[in-house]
Amino acid sequence: MPNRKIPRATAKRLPVYYRYLNVLLNANKHRVSSTELSEAVQVDSATIRRDFSYFGELGKRGYGYDVEKLLNFFKGILKQDKLTSVALVGVGSLGSALMNYNFHQSTNLRISAAFDPKESLANTVKSGIPVYPVEDMKKQIKEQQIDAVILTVPGSESQAVTDQLVEAGVHGILNFTPVRLSVPKDVQVQNIDLTNELQTLIYFIESNKVTTDDED
């Protein structure tokens, strides 16, 4: 694969392509064009071809893409060819919901450990996942070789917990807190702010209403 930096927008679309390729393979479809992919995943075909071009020649002109080969390629890129364990810090309402979900639709991702400062939760098992005291976080993350963590603690605790995670050797944080975390350059943070997402959705709904009213 060419040694090129992949744009963040492209990286975020890779799981979408991977998921649909799985659907195609399960439907015994062996070949797909960028136009067909475009219609299915709602990404224009030029963008799909540009995304794929970062990884070299993945298809053939006039033929399209071999579904199984492309699926296996992205399986390796996304590390879906092996089990990946992640940790969760903060076993509150959101954390508990994520533990209950635990990526049941994926055979390659699982929450293998959770951490919470509450004594009533420490050293218990929730949804089949062991909950450890925060004091054990560094030890468990290193022993279980965990690279990625889901962060669902209160905002006031988020940076202090993040500092501990960085010390433990974590390389990626899925941040559900409203705080923008300060981390070293080699640590990736993906921010998931449900309030922002809903506000954005409401904005587009209202904007669409205004446009429709103007057309009437």
Curated annotation (Swiss-Prot):
Pfam families attached to this UniProt entry: CoA_binding, Put_DNA-bind_N
DNA-binding region, residue intervals: 16-55
A single GO molecular function term of this UniProt record: DNA binding
Binding site for NAD(+): 90-95
Assigned keywords, A-Z: Cytoplasm, DNA-binding, NAD, Repressor, Transcription, Transcription regulation
GO cellular component: cytoplasm
Any Gene Ontology biological process: response to redox state
Signal peptide: none
Subcellular location: Cytoplasm
InterPro entries xref list: CoA-bd, NAD(P)-bd_dom_sf, Rex_DNA-bd_C_dom, Tscrpt_rep_Rex, WH-like_DNA-bd_sf, WH_DNA-bd_sf
Family the entry assigns: Belongs to the transcriptional regulatory Rex family.
HAMAP family named among the record's database cross-references: Rex
Quaternary structure, from the entry: Homodimer.
Name of the protein in its database record: Redox-sensing transcriptional repressor Rex
